[in-house]
């Protein structure tokens, strides 16, 4: 039987310990890490944090309990006792500024009758875990939690503090979440870099072809259309019917082809994407900014690549209609909500003026919504953090390429960028064409994708500490 060197004397024992430390931490046993990550994601998905009303405190307390058991200090900060944010920090040596891992614990509501499973039961099926929040954003919450646990357990020497922020209210109520944290607790979350949701590793046939890291995002700038006309009996139709006026206005906006325009982020995105694309696709991507080719390429995007069509323009989408009190009463007002996702540099007063000219009806009012996120410049690709993300991609997916991209949706990185933080969106592996997407019915995440997400974040955080 082998004998421990510590049994042969104190000097040998100390020498053995020094050799072990010099060799660095033992390799991570990823199978056990994966099992733990799945256990935490399952628990989080079973906590109903639908916003409204939110009730994020239960999820925040779960995270705090896990972290504190490992000796990691964690705080719950809240404007509303039911809607707490969690902030935890592992300190570095202070030679470089902190990193924040940001994720939100609230989720959008789920229409249970449209799901094939209970959206809050964390059902596992065919290698996937189903649940509201599986892709937005409890998988990032889980990855952030696991990285904090690994850093603490393995006693990793850090040059930067690592801050884990599990925030409330991202899905439409930032006043209790990121805005509250920035306004009242900025010293708790201030960082040079932030990592959050928004990106993805896109695979075809199980092989990752590119890792999209969001360095910019479009800006939510919705409006309400209010059409007015005389009320009356449904048996006496009128061409001035408010519903008809509204329908005509919405139809005109639906047919409006707003201009295609590239910025620094989308230009670099298409250049890098061309390097891994077929010759025909590469030709389109490399000439997307060419005025002579733009109309032809734009039509192709509209028909075959709707994500790219949306990425290169300010978009409008009618999302809600409201009119009438009874089927036989012509209403005096009719309303439509239009979701506008603007390019970061869009001149919104001019854009609204163009909408008025297009609608061409003085009886239809355009009422802009109060903005809840600022328009901000893109984060740089020439930073230690972006290089760390590229390093993690090369280590895990050497056949792929990292693409700086512009998110067509919106995240709370906008508020961080407005404070001068270089913020980047990352995300799990998604199979091209998979419809189990965020906010969809039967939202789901491949379990293997969760495991790779944790690993990707781990290697990124280690690399940026160098």
State each model region's role.
Residues 96-163:
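Active-site metal-coordination/substrate-binding segment of hydrolases
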Residues 23-25, 74, 199-209, 213-216, ...:
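Metal-dependent amide/peptide-bond hydrolase catalytic core
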Residues 40, 50-100, 119-123:
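A non-catalytic alpha/beta surface segment that caps or lines the substrate-entry region
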Residues 1-11:
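Bacterial N-terminal signal peptides that target proteins for export
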Residues 30-38, 52-60, 81, 134-137, ...:
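Solvent-exposed, acidic/flexible segments
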Residues 22-54, 68, 73, 113-114, ...:
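N-terminal hydrophobic or amphipathic helices/low-complexity stretches enriched
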